[in-house]
Structure formats: structure tokens, C-alpha cells
């Protein structure tokens, strides 16, 4: 074979190999395309597009080694359509209270980045429930937690996180600078109310969907303050109560009607010989019921009920099962303030059912320890101390604190009634536990059910002191 023939032969072989390789590559591409079509042909692409991918990252140093923890969750999409929460349903009939959430924030905070907080409360939209809380601008087990027993400081802020989660910098949303606060959802957006400033000139800042819409200046220059629990929204209007004046004498109390963050009406209560602070409010059949704290002279709780025009009625829970702390032993009640052990108090709540009332209270008469729910079938109007049901949720030996009401609207639950719920603050640290340099709390919550429940204790459970305290 001469050289020219060799060149032609080698070229032909190379061309043949190239053609075969090209055919194989084309076949491979066709095979992949067909396989992909078979796998995806019957799937609902809309469902995939409606998913939300949420990635949480936490970076820290462990024994001089850098650790990055990444947790990716694929969450099925929710219908986020806005709607006006009607608020015109009656309270659901219930037989007791089922545990709903527990955040264990103090226990987790011994080794994790958890905010120092107090005054937690819960509020729900038609899509979710969130825990709101007042931070101290500090983390547990850190030097800035020192002295956080103080109620009012420029470092405090209203923040929120998903219910049941320990409040941390990684899951919390800033809401407002505040040392007293409230928040609620009208079905279209969050209304937040944050009070901050000096005792003799504090200002309440109203925000709607995060934008400042209104301010309210202290009118008595004596520590303007609000609910420390959720406000109430009915048919697009939201309602809150504020107090200004002495904590141990006659003060001034105003109800505000707010629409999309703007005040449309306000009135001052004509309530001589009554004291209203830190009201726990809920909607019921289109009206608003608030059960409050008398820090002046009542060991039973005052109430105010009003409609959307702010026409109101006032009174005190008549039952001889007293709801405040401190308080006397149960006995003869009154529809006026019960003056025995009536000074001071603690934020609390009750739910009215006709002439009956569910009363939430500490188990101790004199300190913020333990918690129980009591059903008095005639307690709203009668003064005896007879009751039918008592459900324990925190043992007498464990610390409790503030408590308050919140509701779940039918738009959230799918029920045809308003589900009553409550939360309990579990305070730890100072002033009672003097081995610590800080004051903070965790929280638990319960919702009313018309089925079986249980007596038990769900305490905070943290072992003190922490490293920073030693």
C-alpha cells in the first residue's frame, strides 16, 4: 500500500469513528429528553411553583473550629389572600384547655443565642400565630443581661417570632421600639403599637404593615402604657386600651378605634373608683370584651365591654373565686372592687360565657407561682366561690407571671366559632431568684377544646444560675 492509500484509509477510519460517536451522542441526548419527559409529564407544575424554600443558617465557633449549620426546609405554599377578619363569631363551647405551645427559651438560652425578654404575648392572623415579646436588647448568658429587671429602658423593643420557637436573632422580626406594646392582625396587615420614651412624656407609635401611621402622646405624663397582649380587630377596625396616670390610684383610661393604623375615634372611660391596666381583650359576637388588672385596690378583675361605636359598659367580675395576685382566700365576692389584698396585681385574663366565667390565675395567693384555670358557671354575676372545674397547668412550686388571652378566628381554624386561647409567662431570674444578674421568661400557651384535657405542670424548667451569674 503506497503512502497515499495509507492516508486515505486512516482518514476514512477516523471519519467513521467520528460519525459513530456523533450518532451515540445524539442518541444519548434523545434518551435523556425522553426520560425527563416521562418523569415530569404527569406532575402538577403549579404545586412546585407554589412551594417556598426557606434556608436557616447558624454560624458559630466550637472549640476554635468554625461550624456552619444550614437547614433547608421546603414548605408547601399557603394561600396568602388578604381578607377582613369579621370578628362576629361567638366563643367556641369548651370543656377544658389543651397545650398549644411551649418555647423553652430559658433552657435553650443557657447555650444558644436567645433574647432576654419579658411580657410575651401571642396574636394570630388568618394564616399564622406569632409570639410577640419585649426584648431588653441583650442575650441570655451575656454581660448585657445584667440589670434587665428594669421595666423601661431605651434598649427595649417589640419583636416577634413563630409561635413555639425560642426568640433569637435568627428567627425574630423587629416590630417597634417599645417598653409597652400591643399587636393584632385585621386580615390584611399587622397593626403594632409600641410605647417608648421618658415616664413623663412617652409616645405610642402606631405602625401598619411596618410603616408608621400615627402617634399618641402621653396625656397625663404619668407612664403611658397599653395592654401587653393582643389588640382586637372586628370588620377591619382594631381596638386597644391605654392607661395614663398613677398605678396606685385613679388614672385615665382611653379606648382607641384604629383602621389601617389610623385612629378614627377615641373615648375616655368614665370609671371612678376603678383601675384598668394591662387589659386582655377578645372579640365575641362583634363586640370587644376586656378583662384587666386593678393595681390600685381590687383583688378581683375589672372588665370593660364595648361595641364598634365605642359604646361601653364597665364592672368587676363578681365571683368569690378571685383572679388577681395578691388576693385573699376565695370567699365572698363582689361586683365592685374587693379591697382585701387589693393593692398591686399581675396581668391576667378571663373568658365570659353568659353568666359563667373561665378564670385564669396563679395558684399562689401571694406570689407569681403556679397557674390554674377555673370554671365558675355563675361567676360573672354571682358572688359565691363555688366552681365546677379546675385545671392545673403550672404547679405551685414553679414560677409563673403575666398571662393573657388571644383568639383564633374562624378564618384560621375553619371552625364556625372563635377559639379562646391563653398564654402564661414563666418568669425566671430577678427579683425572686437572686443568684442571677438578669430577668427573663419563657412562655406556654393553651387553647380551649370541647374534648378531653389533662391536669399537669409545664414549668420553665431551666437550671439556674448560668455561667454569666457565677
Swiss-Prot record:
EC number: 3.2.1.18
Residues in compartment: Intravirion: 1-6
Glycosylation sites: 44, 58, 63, 68, 88, 146, 235, 285, 365, 455
Keywords, in A-Z order: Calcium, Disulfide bond, Glycoprotein, Glycosidase, Host cell membrane, Host membrane, Hydrolase, Membrane, Metal-binding, Signal-anchor, Transmembrane, Transmembrane helix, Virion
Activity regulation text: Inhibited by the neuraminidase inhibitors zanamivir (Relenza) and oseltamivir (Tamiflu). These drugs interfere with the release of progeny virus from infected cells and are effective against all influenza strains. Resistance to neuraminidase inhibitors is quite rare.
Region (Involved in apical transport and lipid raft association): 11-33
Start and end residues of each stretch annotated as Head of neuraminidase: 91-470
Enzyme class: hydrolase
Domain notes: Intact N-terminus is essential for virion morphogenesis. Possesses two apical sorting signals, one in the ectodomain, which is likely to be a glycan, and the other in the transmembrane domain. The transmembrane domain also plays a role in lipid raft association.
SUBUNIT field: Homotetramer.
Similarity comment text for this entry: Belongs to the glycosyl hydrolase 34 family.
Protein name (Swiss-Prot/TrEMBL): Neuraminidase
Amino acid at each position: 500500500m503506497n503512502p497515499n492509500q495509507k492516508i486515505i484509509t486512516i482518514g476514512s477510519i477516523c471519519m467513521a469513528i467520528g460519525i459513530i460517536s456523533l450518532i451515540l451522542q445524539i442518541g444519548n441526548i434523545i434518551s435523556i429528553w425522553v426520560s425527563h419527559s416521562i418523569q415530569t409529564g404527569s406532575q402538577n407544575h403549579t404545586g412546585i411553583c407554589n412551594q417556598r424554600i426557606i434556608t436557616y443558617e447558624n454560624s458559630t465557633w466550637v472549640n476554635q473550629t468554625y461550624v456552619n449549620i444550614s437547614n433547608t426546609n421546603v414548605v408547601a405554599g399557603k394561600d396568602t389572600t388578604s381578607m377582613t377578619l369579621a370578628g362576629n363569631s361567638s366563643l367556641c363551647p369548651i370543656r377544658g384547655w389543651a397545650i398549644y405551645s411551649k418555647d423553652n427559651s430559658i433552657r435553650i438560652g443557657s447555650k444558644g443565642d436567645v433574647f432576654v425578654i419579658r411580657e410575651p404575648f401571642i396574636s394570630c392572623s388568618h394564616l399564622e400565630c406569632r409570639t410577640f415579646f419585649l426584648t431588653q436588647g441583650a442575650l441570655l448568658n451575656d454581660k448585657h443581661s445584667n440589670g434587665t429587671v428594669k421595666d423601661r429602658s431605651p434598649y427595649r423593643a417589640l419583636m416577634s417570632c413563630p409561635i413555639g420557637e425560642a426568640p433569637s436573632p435568627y428567627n425574630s422580626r423587629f416590630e417597634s421600639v417599645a417598653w409597652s406594646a400591643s399587636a393584632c392582625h385585621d386580615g390584611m396587615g399587622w397593626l403594632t403599637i409600641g410605647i417608648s420614651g421618658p415616664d413623663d412624656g412617652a409616645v405610642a407609635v402606631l405602625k401598619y404593615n411596618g410603616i408608621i401611621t400615627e402617634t399618641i402622646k402621653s396625656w397625663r405624663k404619668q407612664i403611658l402604657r397599653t395592654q401587653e397582649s393582643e389588640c382586637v380587630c372586628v370588620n377591619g377596625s382594631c381596638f386597644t386600651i391605654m392607661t395614663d396616670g398613677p398605678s396606685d390610684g385613679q388614672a385615665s383610661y382611653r379606648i382607641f378605634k384604629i383602621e389601617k393604623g389610623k385612629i378614627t375615634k377615641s373615648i375616655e372611660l368614665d370609671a371612678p373608683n376603678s383601675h384598668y391596666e394591662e387589659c386582655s381583650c377578645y372579640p365575641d359576637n362583634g363586640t370587644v370584651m376586656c378583662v384587666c388588672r386593678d393595681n390600685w385596690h381590687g383583688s378581683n378583675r375589672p372588665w370593660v365591654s364595648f361595641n364598634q361605636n365605642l359604646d361601653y359598659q364597665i364592672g368587676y367580675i363578681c365571683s368569690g373565686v378571685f383572679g388577681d395576685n395578691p388576693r385573699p382566700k376565695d370567699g365572698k365576692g363582689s361586683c365592685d372592687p374587693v379591697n382585701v389584698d387589693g393593692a398591686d396585681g399581675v396581668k391576667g385574663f378571663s373568658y365570659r360565657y353568659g353568666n359563667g366565667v373561665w378564670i385564669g390565675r396563679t395558684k399562689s395567693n401571694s406570689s407569681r407561682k403556679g397557674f390554674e384555670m377555673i370554671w365558675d358557671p355563675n361567676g360573672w354575676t354571682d358572688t359565691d366561690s363555688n366552681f365546677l372545674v379546675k385545671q392545673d397547668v403550672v404547679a405551685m412550686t414553679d414560677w409563673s407571671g403575666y398571662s393573657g388571652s388571644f383568639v383564633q378566628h374562624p378564618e384560621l381554624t375553619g371552625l364556625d366559632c372563635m377559639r379562646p386561647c391563653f398564654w402564661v409567662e414563666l418568669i425566671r431570674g430577678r427579683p425572686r431568684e437572686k443568684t442571677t444578674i438578669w430577668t427573663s421568661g419563657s412562655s406556654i400557651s393553651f387553647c380551649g377544646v370541647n374534648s378531653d384535657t389533662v391536669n399537669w405542670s409545664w414549668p420553665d424548667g431551666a437550671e439556674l444560675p448560668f455561667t454569666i451569674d457565677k
